[in-house]
C-alpha cells in the first residue's frame, strides 16, 4: 500500500515536473516570440530612421548645392557689376569732353584752308591737341560714329535733316553734322547727328 502511495506521489511529482517544464517551455517560447516581435519592431524603426536620415542628408546636400549655386550666381553678378562699373565709370567725364572735341573740329573746319603763317601755326597746334584727345578716347575704347553712305540706324544716328535725292538709296547717311560716340562698342555716349537720304519719287 505504501508503495502504491509513493508511486502515486512520484507520478504526481513527475507530472508536476513535466507541467512545469511545459510551462517553462511555453514561457520561453512566449519570450522568444516577444523578442522576435521586438526585434522586428526595432528593425522597422531602424529602417524608418535610416530612410529619414538618408532623406535629410539628401535635403542638406541639395540645400548646400543650391546655396553654392546661389553664391556662384551672386559672385558672377557682382563681378559683372564691377566690370561694368570699371568699363563705364568714365562715361560722364567723356561726355563732358565731347563738346570740346566738337569745338576743335569746328574751328579746324573754319580755318583749314587759310594759308597765312599765323593760321598755319594755330592749325598745327589744334591738330596736335585734337590728335591727343583722339588717342585718349581710343585708350578708353571710345569709338567715333561718323561714317557716310551707310544705312541709317536709329540706335546710333539721329536724323537732323532729309536730303531728297534719286541717286542715293533711301534711309542712307548722306552727311554727318556732328559725330557720335560709343563706349566699348556697347554703350552709346551720343548719337551721330546726320542727314538722311530719301528718294523724291517715293
Swiss-Prot record:
It comes from the Bacteria. Keywords: Chaperone, Cytoplasm, Stress response. Participates actively in the response to hyperosmotic and heat shock by preventing the aggregation of stress-denatured proteins, in association with DnaK and GrpE. It is the nucleotide exchange factor for DnaK and may function as a thermosensor. Unfolded proteins bind initially to DnaJ; upon interaction with the DnaJ-bound protein, DnaK hydrolyzes its bound ATP, resulting in the formation of a stable complex. GrpE releases ADP from DnaK; ATP binding to DnaK triggers the release of the substrate protein, thus completing the reaction cycle. PROSITE patterns: GRPE. It is found in: Cytoplasm. The keyword Cytoplasm applies. SUPFAM superfamilies: Coiled-coil domain of nucleotide exchange factor GrpE, Head domain of nucleotide exchange factor GrpE. It holds the Pfam family GrpE. HAMAP family: GrpE. Homodimer. Its main location: cytoplasm. GO terms for molecular function: adenyl-nucleotide exchange factor activity; protein homodimerization activity; protein-folding chaperone binding; unfolded protein binding. GO terms for cellular component: cytoplasm. InterPro entries: GrpE, GrpE_coiled_coil, GrpE_head. The keyword Chaperone applies. Belongs to the GrpE family. This is Protein GrpE 1. GO terms for biological process: protein folding.
Amino acid at each position: 500500500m505504501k508503495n502504491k502511495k509513493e508511486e502515486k506521489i512520484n507520478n504526481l511529482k513527475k507530472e508536476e515536473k513535466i507541467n512545469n517544464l511545459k510551462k517553462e517551455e511555453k514561457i520561453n517560447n512566449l519570450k522568444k516570440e516577444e523578442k522576435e516581435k521586438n526585434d522586428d519592431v526595432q528593425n522597422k524603426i531602424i529602417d524608418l530612421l535610416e530612410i529619414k536620415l538618408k532623406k535629410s542628408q539628401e535635403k542638406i546636400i541639395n540645400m548646400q548645392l543650391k546655396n553654392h549655386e546661389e553664391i556662384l550666381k551672386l559672385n558672377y553678378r557682382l563681378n559683372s557689376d564691377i566690370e561694368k562699373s570699371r568699363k563705364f565709370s568714365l562715361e560722364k567725364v567723356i561726355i563732358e569732353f565731347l563738346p570740346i572735341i566738337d569745338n576743335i573740329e569746328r574751328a579746324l573746319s573754319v580755318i583749314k584752308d587759310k594759308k597765312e603763317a599765323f593760321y598755319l601755326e594755330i592749325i598745327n597746334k589744334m591738330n596736335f591737341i585734337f590728335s591727343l584727345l583722339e588717342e585718349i578716347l581710343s585708350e578708353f575704347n571710345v569709338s567715333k560714329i561718323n561714317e557716310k553712305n551707310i544705312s541709317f540706324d536709329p540706335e546710333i544716328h539721329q536724323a537732323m535733316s532729309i536730303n531728297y535725292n534719286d541717286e542715293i538709296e533711301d534711309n542712307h547717311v548722306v552727311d554727318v553734322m556732328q559725330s557720335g560716340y560709343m563706349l566699348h562698342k556697347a554703350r552709346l555716349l551720343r548719337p551721330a547727328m546726320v542727314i538722311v537720304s530719301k528718294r523724291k519719287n517715293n
